[in-house]
Structure formats: structure tokens, C-alpha cells
Amino acid sequence: MVEFSHTKKIGSAGRFGPRYGRKIRVRLRDVEIKQNKEYKCPVCAFPKLKRAGTSIWVCDKCGAKIAGGAYTPETGAGKVVTKAIRRVIESKSREI
């Protein structure tokens, strides 16, 4: 009998077999896909940013270490704050 470490629908979460329920395994699959994906480095803009640990992201090219979200380098709240800061900077530059 051959055991698989993944399945077609659930992906890497197939290693749990029928345990824990389908919904949780699908959520786990989605999180694992996000955290193992390569992201663009904000310093050198090269797509080599990888997860080194919880909330720690390291660029393989320039060696930059960035603190981000647990599963993605930038969280939803971080994106909102970045946009707000950009708006403030733009409004100040228009006044001058």
C-alpha cells in the first residue's frame, strides 16, 4: 500500500487523512500556500523574500531581514496604514 503526503483537492494538508475535518484542512492548505510562496523584497524588489520563522522574512538576494505578518510579509492592517501614510505625505507635498 502506497501512502501519499498530499491529495489532489487538499494538497499538503492531505497528510492528515480524514482527521480534523475538510474545512480545517482546506484552511491549512491555503495558509501553507501563502507562507511558502516567494514574495518581492521591499528593499531590492527581487522576488526572493522567503519566510525564515514566525513573522521573520529574509531576502535571499540582498540579505534584508524584515518583520511582517506570520504567514505573509505584509498584513492587511499594514497595507491600510501604509496607504494612510502615503495619503498624508501626498497632501503635505501638495500644500507646499
Curated annotation (Swiss-Prot):
Binds 1 zinc ion per subunit. A zinc finger (C4-type) spans 41-62. SUPFAM superfamilies: Zn-binding ribosomal proteins (SSF57829). Its cofactor is Zn(2+). GO terms for biological process: translation. NCBIfam families: eL43_euk_arch (TIGR00280), PRK03976.1 (NF003058). Belongs to the eukaryotic ribosomal protein eL43 family. This is Large ribosomal subunit protein eL43. It comes from Methanococcus vannielii (strain ATCC 35089 / DSM 1224 / JCM 13029 / OCM 148 / SB).
